[in-house]
Amino acid sequence: MNNIWWQTKGQGNVHLVLLHGWGLNAEVWRCIDEELSSHFTLHLVDLPGFGRSRGFGALSLAEMAEAVLRQAPDKAIWLGWSLGGLVASQIALTHPERVQALVTVASSPCFSARDEWPGIKPDVLAGFQQQLSDDFQRTVERFLALQTMGTETARQDARALKKTVLALPMPEVDVLNGGLEILKTVDLRLPLQNVPMPFLRLYGYLDGLVPRKVVPMLDKLWPHSESYIFAKAAHAPFISHPVEFRHVLVALKQRV
Protein backbone atom coordinates (compact mmCIF):
# COMPACT_ATOMS: atom_id res chain seq x y z
CA MET A 1 0.00 0.00 0.00
CA ASN A 2 1.27 3.47 -0.84
CA ASN A 3 1.78 5.67 2.17
CA ILE A 4 0.78 9.27 2.62
CA TRP A 5 3.56 11.50 4.01
CA TRP A 6 2.30 12.75 7.35
CA GLN A 7 3.93 14.86 10.06
CA THR A 8 2.40 15.54 13.48
CA LYS A 9 3.59 18.34 15.76
CA GLY A 10 2.30 20.26 18.75
CA GLN A 11 0.51 19.26 21.93
CA GLY A 12 -2.89 20.93 21.63
CA ASN A 13 -6.02 19.11 22.79
CA VAL A 14 -7.66 19.73 19.38
CA HIS A 15 -6.29 18.06 16.24
CA LEU A 16 -5.98 20.21 13.10
CA VAL A 17 -5.27 18.57 9.72
CA LEU A 18 -3.93 20.89 6.98
CA LEU A 19 -4.43 19.92 3.33
CA HIS A 20 -2.53 21.88 0.65
CA GLY A 21 -3.59 22.87 -2.87
CA TRP A 22 -2.85 21.73 -6.41
CA GLY A 23 0.80 21.32 -7.43
CA LEU A 24 2.10 21.99 -3.92
CA ASN A 25 2.93 20.07 -0.74
CA ALA A 26 2.78 20.45 3.04
CA GLU A 27 5.84 22.73 3.11
CA VAL A 28 3.46 25.53 2.13
CA TRP A 29 2.30 25.66 5.78
CA ARG A 30 5.77 26.37 7.22
CA CYS A 31 4.90 30.08 7.48
CA ILE A 32 2.31 29.30 10.17
CA ASP A 33 3.00 25.79 11.50
CA GLU A 34 5.10 26.83 14.52
CA GLU A 35 2.46 29.30 15.73
CA LEU A 36 -0.42 26.89 15.12
CA SER A 37 1.33 23.98 16.85
CA SER A 38 1.25 25.92 20.13
CA HIS A 39 -2.58 25.83 19.94
CA PHE A 40 -3.30 22.52 18.17
CA THR A 41 -1.91 19.07 17.57
CA LEU A 42 -1.08 19.83 13.97
CA HIS A 43 -1.07 17.31 11.12
CA LEU A 44 0.82 18.25 7.93
CA VAL A 45 -0.05 16.07 4.96
CA ASP A 46 1.22 15.68 1.40
CA LEU A 47 -1.82 14.75 -0.70
CA PRO A 48 -1.48 11.48 -2.67
CA GLY A 49 1.00 11.89 -5.52
CA PHE A 50 2.21 15.29 -4.27
CA GLY A 51 5.39 16.12 -2.35
CA ARG A 52 6.65 13.05 -0.49
CA SER A 53 3.47 10.97 -0.97
CA ARG A 54 4.86 9.13 -3.99
CA GLY A 55 3.62 6.10 -5.88
CA PHE A 56 0.10 7.32 -6.56
CA GLY A 57 -1.40 7.93 -9.98
CA ALA A 58 -4.27 10.27 -10.76
CA LEU A 59 -7.07 9.76 -8.23
CA SER A 60 -10.69 10.79 -8.08
CA LEU A 61 -11.74 13.12 -5.26
CA ALA A 62 -13.31 10.21 -3.35
CA GLU A 63 -10.13 8.10 -3.70
CA MET A 64 -7.95 11.00 -2.56
CA ALA A 65 -10.13 11.56 0.51
CA GLU A 66 -10.07 7.87 1.48
CA ALA A 67 -6.28 7.68 1.07
CA VAL A 68 -5.77 10.67 3.39
CA LEU A 69 -8.31 9.47 5.94
CA ARG A 70 -6.48 6.17 6.48
CA GLN A 71 -3.73 7.89 8.50
CA ALA A 72 -5.85 10.58 10.13
CA PRO A 73 -6.70 11.05 13.83
CA ASP A 74 -10.11 9.79 14.97
CA LYS A 75 -11.48 13.33 15.11
CA ALA A 76 -10.01 16.63 13.93
CA ILE A 77 -10.70 20.02 12.49
CA TRP A 78 -10.07 19.54 8.77
CA LEU A 79 -8.70 22.56 6.93
CA GLY A 80 -8.27 22.43 3.18
CA TRP A 81 -6.80 25.11 0.94
CA SER A 82 -8.00 25.34 -2.68
CA LEU A 83 -8.02 21.75 -4.05
CA GLY A 84 -7.42 20.62 -0.46
CA GLY A 85 -10.73 22.27 0.44
CA LEU A 86 -12.53 19.83 -1.85
CA VAL A 87 -10.71 16.90 -0.20
CA ALA A 88 -11.62 18.14 3.30
CA SER A 89 -15.23 18.71 2.16
CA GLN A 90 -15.43 15.20 0.72
CA ILE A 91 -14.26 13.76 4.05
CA ALA A 92 -16.88 15.85 5.88
CA LEU A 93 -19.56 14.44 3.57
CA THR A 94 -18.56 10.78 3.78
CA HIS A 95 -17.18 10.58 7.35
CA PRO A 96 -18.84 13.39 9.34
CA GLU A 97 -18.10 11.63 12.62
CA ARG A 98 -14.37 12.21 11.99
CA VAL A 99 -14.73 15.96 11.41
CA GLN A 100 -14.96 18.28 14.41
CA ALA A 101 -15.19 21.31 12.11
CA LEU A 102 -14.66 21.92 8.40
CA VAL A 103 -12.56 24.88 7.25
CA THR A 104 -12.08 25.72 3.58
CA VAL A 105 -9.52 28.33 2.52
CA ALA A 106 -9.72 30.07 -0.88
CA SER A 107 -11.75 27.10 -2.04
CA SER A 108 -14.94 26.65 -3.99
CA PRO A 109 -17.37 23.72 -4.02
CA CYS A 110 -17.35 24.19 -7.79
CA PHE A 111 -14.15 25.77 -9.16
CA SER A 112 -15.34 25.68 -12.75
CA ALA A 113 -17.60 28.47 -14.02
CA ARG A 114 -21.15 27.26 -14.74
CA ASP A 115 -24.44 28.93 -15.64
CA GLU A 116 -24.91 31.77 -13.16
CA TRP A 117 -21.95 30.51 -11.14
CA PRO A 118 -18.63 32.42 -11.11
CA GLY A 119 -15.43 30.43 -11.36
CA ILE A 120 -12.51 29.52 -13.60
CA LYS A 121 -13.55 29.18 -17.24
CA PRO A 122 -13.46 25.45 -18.16
CA ASP A 123 -11.33 26.20 -21.24
CA VAL A 124 -8.70 27.81 -18.97
CA LEU A 125 -8.50 24.62 -16.89
CA ALA A 126 -8.44 22.52 -20.06
CA GLY A 127 -5.64 24.77 -21.35
CA PHE A 128 -3.60 24.13 -18.22
CA GLN A 129 -4.13 20.39 -18.74
CA GLN A 130 -2.90 20.66 -22.34
CA GLN A 131 0.14 22.75 -21.34
CA LEU A 132 1.11 20.26 -18.64
CA SER A 133 2.17 17.77 -21.27
CA ASP A 134 4.22 20.43 -23.08
CA ASP A 135 6.06 22.19 -20.23
CA PHE A 136 4.69 21.19 -16.89
CA GLN A 137 7.13 23.12 -14.68
CA ARG A 138 6.28 26.38 -16.44
CA THR A 139 2.56 25.55 -16.27
CA VAL A 140 2.75 25.01 -12.50
CA GLU A 141 4.66 28.29 -12.12
CA ARG A 142 1.98 30.15 -14.12
CA PHE A 143 -0.74 28.67 -11.91
CA LEU A 144 1.17 29.77 -8.79
CA ALA A 145 1.61 33.31 -10.14
CA LEU A 146 -2.17 33.54 -10.59
CA GLN A 147 -2.63 32.77 -6.90
CA THR A 148 -0.87 35.86 -5.54
CA MET A 149 -1.72 38.51 -8.17
CA GLY A 150 -3.05 41.78 -6.80
CA THR A 151 -1.72 41.63 -3.25
CA GLU A 152 0.75 44.15 -1.83
CA THR A 153 3.19 41.28 -1.25
CA ALA A 154 2.46 39.45 -4.53
CA ARG A 155 6.10 38.95 -5.55
CA GLN A 156 7.34 37.61 -2.24
CA ASP A 157 4.20 35.46 -1.84
CA ALA A 158 4.76 33.98 -5.31
CA ARG A 159 8.41 33.31 -4.40
CA ALA A 160 7.28 31.52 -1.23
CA LEU A 161 4.95 29.28 -3.24
CA LYS A 162 7.60 28.57 -5.88
CA LYS A 163 10.12 27.70 -3.15
CA THR A 164 7.58 25.23 -1.73
CA VAL A 165 7.20 23.54 -5.10
CA LEU A 166 10.92 23.38 -5.80
CA ALA A 167 11.77 22.09 -2.30
CA LEU A 168 10.59 18.60 -3.30
CA PRO A 169 10.40 16.55 -6.50
CA MET A 170 7.65 17.70 -8.86
CA PRO A 171 4.49 15.57 -8.91
CA GLU A 172 4.00 13.30 -11.92
CA VAL A 173 2.14 14.86 -14.84
CA ASP A 174 -0.80 12.45 -14.51
CA VAL A 175 -1.20 13.40 -10.82
CA LEU A 176 -1.25 17.11 -11.72
CA ASN A 177 -3.65 16.39 -14.55
CA GLY A 178 -5.91 14.40 -12.21
CA GLY A 179 -5.98 17.31 -9.78
CA LEU A 180 -7.01 19.70 -12.56
CA GLU A 181 -9.71 17.23 -13.61
CA ILE A 182 -11.14 17.39 -10.06
CA LEU A 183 -11.09 21.21 -10.17
CA LYS A 184 -12.78 21.12 -13.60
CA THR A 185 -15.56 18.61 -12.87
CA VAL A 186 -16.43 18.42 -9.15
CA ASP A 187 -19.52 20.25 -7.86
CA LEU A 188 -20.29 19.92 -4.13
CA ARG A 189 -22.64 22.90 -3.84
CA LEU A 190 -25.76 20.88 -3.04
CA PRO A 191 -24.17 18.04 -1.00
CA LEU A 192 -22.54 20.55 1.38
CA GLN A 193 -25.93 22.03 2.27
CA ASN A 194 -26.34 19.24 4.80
CA VAL A 195 -23.01 18.90 6.63
CA PRO A 196 -23.70 18.76 10.38
CA MET A 197 -20.44 20.14 11.80
CA PRO A 198 -19.31 23.79 12.20
CA PHE A 199 -18.27 25.01 8.76
CA LEU A 200 -15.99 28.04 8.26
CA ARG A 201 -15.13 29.39 4.81
CA LEU A 202 -12.14 31.72 4.43
CA TYR A 203 -11.55 33.87 1.35
CA GLY A 204 -9.17 36.45 -0.08
CA TYR A 205 -10.89 39.56 -1.41
CA LEU A 206 -8.39 39.75 -4.30
CA ASP A 207 -8.49 36.04 -5.20
CA GLY A 208 -8.36 35.55 -8.97
CA LEU A 209 -9.23 31.83 -8.83
CA VAL A 210 -12.18 31.85 -6.40
CA PRO A 211 -14.16 35.02 -7.18
CA ARG A 212 -15.52 36.85 -4.13
CA LYS A 213 -18.96 36.83 -5.79
CA VAL A 214 -19.32 33.22 -4.59
CA VAL A 215 -19.24 34.31 -0.93
CA PRO A 216 -22.78 35.78 -0.65
CA MET A 217 -24.10 33.03 -2.93
CA LEU A 218 -22.78 30.36 -0.56
CA ASP A 219 -23.87 32.34 2.52
CA LYS A 220 -27.39 31.96 1.14
CA LEU A 221 -27.01 28.33 -0.01
CA TRP A 222 -25.33 27.21 3.23
CA PRO A 223 -26.87 29.36 6.00
CA HIS A 224 -25.35 27.11 8.69
CA SER A 225 -21.81 28.02 7.55
CA GLU A 226 -19.77 31.14 8.32
CA SER A 227 -17.62 33.14 5.92
CA TYR A 228 -14.65 35.43 6.54
CA ILE A 229 -12.86 37.53 3.94
CA PHE A 230 -9.21 38.64 4.25
CA ALA A 231 -9.52 42.15 2.81
CA LYS A 232 -6.07 42.41 1.20
CA ALA A 233 -5.36 38.75 0.48
CA ALA A 234 -5.55 36.79 -2.78
CA HIS A 235 -5.53 32.97 -3.06
CA ALA A 236 -3.07 32.28 -0.20
CA PRO A 237 -4.17 34.33 2.86
CA PHE A 238 -2.10 32.22 5.26
CA ILE A 239 1.06 33.39 3.44
CA SER A 240 0.13 37.06 3.03
CA HIS A 241 -1.69 37.45 6.39
CA PRO A 242 -0.35 34.74 8.75
CA VAL A 243 -1.18 36.52 12.03
CA GLU A 244 -4.78 37.27 11.08
CA PHE A 245 -5.12 33.73 9.73
CA ARG A 246 -3.93 32.23 13.02
CA HIS A 247 -6.32 34.42 15.03
CA VAL A 248 -9.28 33.18 12.99
CA LEU A 249 -8.36 29.53 13.61
CA VAL A 250 -7.71 29.99 17.33
CA ALA A 251 -11.11 31.70 17.64
CA LEU A 252 -12.71 28.72 15.89
CA LYS A 253 -11.00 26.31 18.29
CA GLN A 254 -12.58 28.11 21.23
CA ARG A 255 -16.02 27.63 19.68
CA VAL A 256 -15.73 23.92 18.97
UniProtKB/Swiss-Prot annotation:
Residues reported to bind substrate: W22, S82, L83, F143, L144, A145, L146, Q147, H235
NCBIfam families noted in UniProt: bioH, PRK10349.1
The keyword Hydrolase belongs to this UniProt entry's keyword annotation: yes
InterPro entries hit by this protein: AB_hydrolase_1, AB_hydrolase_fold, BioH, Carboxylesterase_BioH
Any Gene Ontology biological process: biotin biosynthetic process
EC number assigned by the record: 3.1.1.85
Protein name: Pimeloyl-[acyl-carrier protein] methyl ester esterase
UniProt cross-references to Gene3D superfamilies, sorted A to Z: alpha/beta hydrolase (3.40.50.1820)
Family: Belongs to the AB hydrolase superfamily. Carboxylesterase BioH family.
Biological or metabolic pathway of the protein: Cofactor biosynthesis; biotin biosynthesis
GO molecular function: pimelyl-[acyl-carrier protein] methyl ester esterase activity
SUPFAM superfamilies reported for this sequence: alpha/beta-Hydrolases (SSF53474)
Record's keyword annotation contains Disulfide bond: no
